[in-house]
Each structure stands twice: as structure tokens, then as C-alpha cells.
Design a protein with these regions (language model features):
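C-terminal accessory regions
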Residues: 138, 246-247, 257-373
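Conserved helicase motor core of P-loop NTPases
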Residues: 88-253, 264
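Structural motif
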Residues: 58-62, 86, 188, 233, ...
Length: 373
């Protein structure tokens, strides 16, 4: 048809995945809209809007469940009214961190053309990952008894046992018995705090997978000591940080929220930490280390838009807001080949039954239906 099409997603990780599966360049929505900082207010602003619209015939936005009402508003302002906009996403995943849930509102309004995709290509149809994802989505308990599939449940009697089991899976059992190296395993947890939160799990996983050694330099920042060899994640979009290809073939700028890399070197003389992201590397001044977090374990929220060869999920007592069906469903659907849940079966059952999501009032559904609140 000869149409010019632009692809985008809410996070850098999701945009990268979109590029990989389509073979076409994709960017973050922020980069598409040319985000910048207003020097007078210090607030983020977008160059693209009604007066300076995006130039394309069609726009495809992936992972729409992560897009809040404010970002969608800015996106729509920048797209001329006579163009095509295709929004792709899974409304059963976690809602955005920011205000509203516009993707869900649009679907529930029954005013827009919708195509529901039902065929799964990531796993075989008989995959227990797929079947349990469907079961959880319907509010049915997942099958936790199977021992001959891609989905396993390992019971634990305490938070300490959960953490110890996860460390053993990452450091010994999966690499030895299934040939899955630690760097292809992602530990997910609903919470940041507590014995099975990201802070403690990253601490014990670092101690096991990347212990201190005389040959490894370290740099402390906050409550964590970054060490050469550590797995880390960028936690906010940085459009200005410079990177270079490992083969020296190109240079550029921009490391994005959700990008995962490995600490290659720490220079005390230059006060920098060098992180390798796939085929690129970037230098972080010590003052910039607040943009990085350890990534041996991450929250389920942070995993949205990504997929991993193997996922280990902790399931333990916590806030009903965090232990919800959407959290469990999102975690299960991050796994490509293997999913292991470690914890309490009662917790998994409670998550399956907890379909409550904090109510979000944006008025979008009613506006689309031509009604007033």
C-alpha cells in the first residue's frame, strides 16, 4: 500500500522487543513525541503536538495497557485526525503506573473497532504456561501439580525458604539440570520490601551469582554496592546518555527505562561505571547511579513489555493490591519456555481470586459513548 508506518511502545524494553519481532524500527512513545525538559519549569514537554504533528500514514502502539491517560492525550494531540492509529495490548495485564486505564476504557466503551487475537505463537498450544495463563485470566486456579511440563510450583514454608529456593534454582538447578544459564533467568516478585521483595532477593542473588572477589571493583550507591559483573536495569528514560557499539561501528545516545545490562567495569579514577546493554556500552558517572538498579530480581510491574526464557515468581503473603490476578497473569505471560512459582499455594489461589484493581476514573469510557458523568 506504500503507507509510512511508525511503531512505538511505552518503554525502551517494549520498543526493542517490537523491533525484534517486526523487523522494523520502533521507539518509545516519549522519543516519538520528542520529549525534552522545559528550561524554565524543569517539566517534561513534547515537541510534537497539533502545531508540529507526527508525519506518517499509520501508527502502531504496542503494550497499550501500560499507557496512562496523560501520555495517551499527548500522543493523540500529535497525530493528525486523518491518519490511522492501531493500539495493541492485553487489557488483562497490570494497569499503568500513572493515572487512568485508557486502553481498558476504550475496549469497554464498545464504540471502537476491536480485533481480539486468540492464537498464541510464543509457546505451543499444549504449553502449561499458556493453559494456566488462560485459567488465571478466567479466575480458575492454575494447575500446580504437573511435574512434566514448562510450569512448576515449589512449596515453601517461610520467606527465607522462598529466597533460598530461588537462589538454588538460579545458581545450580536450572543451569545444571535444564541448561538455562543464570543470565537467561528472571526472578519476579510482586513487592520491593520484605524477605521476598526485590531488595532482599537482589542482595542474596548477587551474593550467590556474583560474589565479591579481589579482582572485582565495587561502588556503593544507596543501599546497594554495584559490582563488576552485576546485572542491572535502567529505571528511567535517559535520552542524553552516550553509548557506543561494542564493535565501534556506531555511536548514539539514549538508554531507556527497562533496559537490562551488565556492569563491565568500574573506574575509581574516572568515577564511572561502564554497563553493556546487548551490543552497546555506556558510561555512568557515579552521580548517575540512581538511574540503575540491580536486576537479578525485579517487580512484576517492571517486567511488563518484556519476555524471558525462564521466569521464577515468588508467591508469599502481602498487600491485596499487589497480590492480584493481574499481577499473577502478567508474571505468567512473561515466561517463554519455563515458569516456576515458589511459595504458598494459598497465596497463588488468593491472587487468582483477587480480581480487584484500584478503581480509576478518567471519564474516557463515558465520553466515547457520548455520555456525561
Amino acid at each position: 500500500m506504500g503507507l509510512k508506518c511508525l511503531l512505538a511502545a511505552p518503554t525502551g524494553r517494549a520498543a526493542k522487543r517490537l523491533t525484534e519481532v517486526t523487523g522494523h524500527d520502533a521507539s518509545t512513545i516519549h522519543r516519538l513525541l520528542e520529549a525534552g525538559i522545559d528550561p524554565n519549569t524543569g517539566m517534561m514537554v513534547f515537541t510534537k503536538d497539533e502545531s508540529n504533528p507526527l508525519k506518517a500514514d499509520a501508527f502502531i502502539i504496542d503494550e497499550m495497557s501500560m499507557v496512562d491517560i496523560q501520555l495517551l492525550h499527548c500522543l493523540l494531540r500529535a497525530i493528525p485526525g486523518n491518519k490511522r492509529l492501531i493500539l495493541v495490548g492485553d487489557p488483562d495485564q497490570l494497569p499503568p503506573v500513572g493515572p487512568g486505564f485508557p486502553f481498558g476504557d476504550m475496549l469497554r466503551s464498545n464504540t471502537l473497532p476491536v480485533v481480539r487475537l486468540t492464537e498464541i505463537f510464543r509457546q505451543a498450544q499444549e504449553s502449561l504456561i499458556v493453559m494456566n495463563a488462560h485459567r488465571v485470566n478466567r479466575g480458575e486456579a492454575p494447575d500446580l501439580r504437573s511435574r512434566k511440563s514448562d510450569f512448576f510450583f515449589l512449596p515453601a514454608r517461610s520467606e527465607q525458604e522462598v529466597a533460598q529456593t530461588i537462589v538454588d534454582l538460579c545458581a545450580r538447578r536450572l543451569p545444571t539440570n535444564m541448561g538455562i544459564p543464570p543470565e537467561q533467568i528472571q526472578v519476579l516478585t510482586p513487592t520491593r520490601k520484605g524477605g521476598v521483595g526485590t531488595w532482599n532477593l537482589n542482595r542474596v542473588l548477587q551474593a550467590s551469582l556474583n560474589p565479591p572477589a579481589p579482582t572485582k571493583k565495587e561502588r556503593s550507591f544507596g543501599d546497594f554496592s554495584f559490582r563488576e559483573g552485576d546485572r542491572v536495569m535502567q529505571i528511567r528514560n535517559n535520552y542524553d546518555i552516550l553509548w557506543k557499539k561494542l564493535d565501534g561501528s556506531a555511536v548514539g545516545s539514549g538508554i531507556f527505562n527497562g533496559d537490562i545490562g551488565t556492569v563491565r567495569a568500574i573506574s575509581m579514577e574516572q568515577e564511572t561505571v561502564t554497563v553493556v546493554f546487548d551490543d552497546r556500552e555506556a558510561d555512568y558517572d557515579f552521580t548517575m547511579l540512581g538511574e540503575l538498579e540491580p536486576a537479578y530480581a525485579m517487580t512484576v510491574h517492571k517486567s511488563q513489555g518484556s519476555e524471558y526464557r525462564a521466569v521464577i515468581l515468588s508467591a508469599w503473603n502481602g498487600s491485596p493490591y499487589l497480590l492480584s490476578r493481574s499481577v499473577l497473569y502478567t508474571a505468567i505471560t512473561r515466561a517463554r519456555e519455563l515458569l516456576i512459582i515458589v511459595g504458598r499455594e494459598e497465596c497463588v489461589a488468593a491472587m487468582t481470586q483477587n480480581a480487584k484493581v484500584g478503581r480509576r476514573y478518567s471519564g474516557l469510557k463515558l465520553r466515547l459513548q457520548g455520555k456525561t458523568e
